[in-house]
Amino acid sequence: MLQLLLAVFIGGGTGSVARWLLSMRFNPLHQAIPLGTLAANLIGAFIIGMGFAWFSRMTNIDPVWKVLITTGFCGGLTTFSTFSAEVVFLLQEGRFGWALLNVFVNLLGSFAMTALAFWLFSASTAH
């Protein structure tokens, strides 16, 4: 149990630092769409799709690695709370179109990235 807790801790911290770096680098590039948050959510969605595909095929992977990558790293990297706050800020500024676009791109993009990764890595591990 301690190993699993440490895996979540290390993965979560690493994912959170990665999200912060993405936000620092990419959020200033666009006034309405926080590109760093979007990148974090899309990358995290892709990684978790890839992980689930691999983990469903390779049953001998240590659960510590599964938890480190999915709950830890992807949990720290992706952020629904920051995304929600950024949408609320756009709404408060009266930027309703940008808020809606932000919701659309984050949600559909994340679903698409997870499905794409799952499909790609399920196909690659099937051979």
UniProtKB/Swiss-Prot annotation:
Activity control: Na(+) is not transported, but it plays an essential structural role and its presence is essential for fluoride channel function.
Cross-referenced Pfam families: CRCB (PF02537)
Keywords: Cell inner membrane, Cell membrane, Ion channel, Ion transport, Membrane, Metal-binding, Sodium, Transmembrane, Transmembrane helix, Transport
Molecular function terms, GO-annotated: fluoride channel activity; metal ion binding
Swiss-Prot/TrEMBL catalytic activity: fluoride(in) = fluoride(out)
Membrane topology per record: Multi-pass membrane protein
GO cellular component: plasma membrane
Transmembrane segments: 4-24, 35-55, 71-91, 103-123
Domain of life: Bacteria
Predominant subcellular localization, coarse grouping: membrane
Subcellular location: Cell inner membrane
Binding-site residues, Na(+): G75, T78
Presence of keyword Transmembrane: yes
Gene Ontology BP, a term: cellular detoxification of fluoride
Chain's role: Fluoride-specific ion channel. Important for reducing fluoride concentration in the cell, thus reducing its toxicity.
Protein family per UniProt: Belongs to the fluoride channel Fluc/FEX (TC 1.A.43) family.
NCBIfam families, per the entry: crcB, PRK14196.1
Protein name: Fluoride-specific ion channel FluC
Organism of this sequence: Escherichia coli O139:H28 (strain E24377A / ETEC)
